Amino acid sequence: MSWIERIKSNITPTRKASIPEGVWTKCDSCGQVLYRAELERNLEVCPKCDHHMRMTARNRLHSLLDEGSLVELGSELEPKDVLKFRDSKKYKDRLASAQKETGEKDALVVMKGTLYGMPVVAAAFEFAFMGGSMGSVVGARFVRAVEQALEDNCPLICFSASGGARMQEALMSLMQMAKTSAALAKMQERGLPYISVLTDPTMGGVSASFAMLGDLNIAEPKALIGFAGPRVIEQTVREKLPPGFQRSEFLIEKGAIDMIIRRPEMRLKLASILAKLMNLPAPNPEAPREGVVVPPVPDQEPEA
């Protein structure tokens, strides 16, 4: 046996470690490779560039309300294809596909619970469900949220993320703009706070109704907020729009919104604002709250 064969016989080949799918993800803005569980702990905010990625409606509500206090409202409401609408695909098929993809029946999730011990009702849009579009069920659930806030004499918070009214429901979707706005008038009559949080994106009929009717209209950083999109506006007016047009930083500069709050700071700041509006003691930021246990980061990073 030659010397090289003797060396080769003592070499034990190693197996390549396999990384389960979904452990790592990439930031949409800076391209940084991120550990999925670490990103979830940071509320879907990139630790490198502070880009606020989209959150699911349930994750958003669970990150806002106190552990163990959440009760879902309006979950029995389901959309119906009353018009038998069809474009390139049947509406009922689009609904079935969206429900399978997201696990939600429609684009708005409503829950009541407590925020630092203070009773609140909160609603959040699921943008992955047909672009967070507003149909009759979204309108009905929002009104249910208002009614619950009135019954409990507590504030209402809504996190918007929507492309606007759902075209497959035609006038029934447009009617929700008036329906939700009329419901909010009852909150105003009672003197109960309604805080609207505009996330990326908040457009169309949602921005033209309840999303901009808050006692405070708060936005996340760099959120796209408006009625028509920038490209549509440019094609209509035949002019180039200024940089950052319709982003939350542009809107606060023009006085269209009241505040911009980073997502990791949202929970405490909302609680502080509502405590003042409701004449309640300020929340204790040191109050214990169970968090998500994040597993350790794997030693091996994914291959480029």
Swiss-Prot record:
GO cellular component: acetate CoA-transferase complex
GO molecular function, one term: zinc ion binding
UniProt catalytic activity: N(6)-carboxybiotinyl-L-lysyl-[protein] + acetyl-CoA = N(6)-biotinyl-L-lysyl-[protein] + malonyl-CoA
This enzyme's EC code(s): 2.1.3.15
Stretch list, region Disordered: 284-304
Cofactor note: Binds 1 zinc ion per subunit.
Zinc finger (C4-type): 27-49
UniProt keyword Lipid metabolism, yes or no: yes
Top enzyme category: transferase
One Gene Ontology biological process: malonyl-CoA biosynthetic process
Listed cofactors: Zn(2+)
Main location: cytoplasm
Complex and partners: Acetyl-CoA carboxylase is a heterohexamer composed of biotin carboxyl carrier protein (AccB), biotin carboxylase (AccC) and two subunits each of ACCase subunit alpha (AccA) and ACCase subunit beta (AccD).
Protein's UniProt name: Acetyl-coenzyme A carboxylase carboxyl transferase subunit beta
The organism of origin for this protein: Escherichia coli O6:K15:H31 (strain 536 / UPEC)
